[in-house]
A protein has these predicted regions:
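Surface-exposed binding/hinge segments that line
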Residues: 46, 82-135, 157, 273-276
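Ligand-site clamp/hinge motif
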Residues: 48, 144, 174-225, 360-366, ...
Length: 400
């Protein structure tokens, strides 16, 4: 199963800790505490008692030790988090059934947050030693419904998966309920549907065939709510949505000419009108980010400390054009820059099923074209979008 696949992190694989974006606190879950020494190079983890895997085996320090050592031994660095663990961890030591000490190669104040706390989609997945100990981690699929695989510590188990839906059923013997840590979740069955484009999601939600959905426009939300009063947003009034922790961006491949020239990339940034993107693509449900950092209250001191690096929400097309022309490009009769017989172009890839990213891409294309760059926007499938980003198969991509 994919570590980021639909529902696995929410239902099956529980984290040690969870970052609460509203309070800026790191809350404990399977982990009871993870504290550092004064030098920040020795971290001590204490696991909550009574945690069990879904097959009844106890979750202990042995599972943590086994997982970390597996990642440290991965010479290919192809396993999730193996490169990070090899960068930071010198060794791990078991100190009792529920305690592990991490000895780091150098101080890391973010060790707990970066690797053992859920921030968005998930965190490091801890492996059950009693199943994985005699398996080859590079080939073992960990999927066999007859054996109940995959297992986790979560309150649900995977019961079926297909191209269009993933189904989980509640485990009434979940450790959290048995130990009194948390009550059983209300839903007895959770279904993740692959809905495709926004129109499909909106129709399903309006007909009460979806209980939760994401990535829809303001117009679509208001239409759904007019048809189905049970649909609510995070906030009762504009801007309705909770601010995502990842500001959106246009990533430009700096290995492809002429965009390998930082002055040319700076020109793009100057030409982009971020305020217009918010108005058109987001229908004023967001605001331009000043930096690459999300503007949560806890981040304010850091953002205020770099005011000299704040990004202007309005465009400066003339300054952008000056940078382009200083690199030898001349505006042609068709309105686009040319040099040595070639037009200045930029192809922008977007996620076909992500209406938000597509709309942002559309606005950027028009802004760049108006300034003399022959920009195009190509919507591709999510799997291709992810692969192209990972392997640099793009000129530019709207992402985060």
């Amino acid at each position: 199963p994919s570590p980021t696949g639909p529902g696995m992190n929410q239902c099956v694989w529980e984290p040690l800790f969870i970052l609460n974006y509203e309070t800026a606190e790191i809350e404990s879950w399977i982990g009871e505490s993870l504290t550092a020494n004064q030098a920040l190079d020795v971290w001590t983890l204490t696991i909550r008692p009574d945690v069990e895997w879904s097959d009844g085996e106890p979750f202990t320090a042995d599972d943590i030790i086994f997982t970390i050592n597996t990642l440290l031994a991965d010479d290919t660095q192809s396993l999730g988090d193996s490169a990070s663990m090899q960068q930071w961890v010198k060794r791990v030591e078991k100190v009792g059934l529920l305690k592990v000490i991490f000895y780091l190669k150098s101080p890391n104040p973010r060790f707990k947050l970066d690797y053992f706390s859920v921030r968005v989609g998930g965190s490091m997945i801890i492996l059950p030693e009693h199943i994985w100990s005699d398996k080859d981690p590079s080939t073992f699929k960990f999927y066999d419904p007859k054996k109940g695989w995959p297992i986790g510590t979560g309150a649900y188990r995977l019961v079926s998966t297909s191209m269009n839906e993933v189904v989980f059923d509640r485990r009434d013997d979940w450790w959290g309920a048995k130990s009194g840590f948390q009550p059983l979740p209300e839903p007895k069955r959770l279904i993740w549907l692959i809905t495709g484009v926004e129109e499909n999601r909106a129709l399903l939600a309006a007909n009460s065939e979806l209980d939760s959905l994401t990535d829809i426009t303001l117009c679509a939300f208001e239409s759904i709510r007019a048809q189905n009063s049970n649909i609510v947003a995070w906030k009762d009034e504009m801007p309705y949505a909770w601010l995502d922790p990842c500001p959106r961006q246009l990533s430009v491949n700096h290995t492809i000419p002429p965009w390998d020239n930082p002055k040319m990339r700076k020109a793009i940034s100057l030409i982009i009108d971020r305020q217009q993107i918010v108005k058109i693509a987001y229908e004023d449900t967001s605001f331009p980010s000043k930096t690459i950092l999300v503007e949560y209250p806890a981040m304010k001191p850091y953002i205020d400390a770099i005011q000299d690096l704040w990004i202007d929400p309005k465009s400066n097309v003339s300054a952008g054009r000056q940078l382009i022309e200083a690199e030898g490009w001349q505006l042609g009769s068709n309105g686009y820059y040319q040099k040595s017989g070639e037009e200045l172009s930029l192809n922008i890839q977007t996620h076909a099923a992500a209406i938000e990213l597509r709309r942002v891409g559309d606005v950027i294309v028009e802004q760049l074209r108006s300034a003399g760059i022959l920009a195009t926007n190509r919507a591709i499938t999510g799997a291709t979008w992810q692969e192209n980003k990972a392997f640099g198969k793009f000129e530019a991509v709207v992402d985060w």
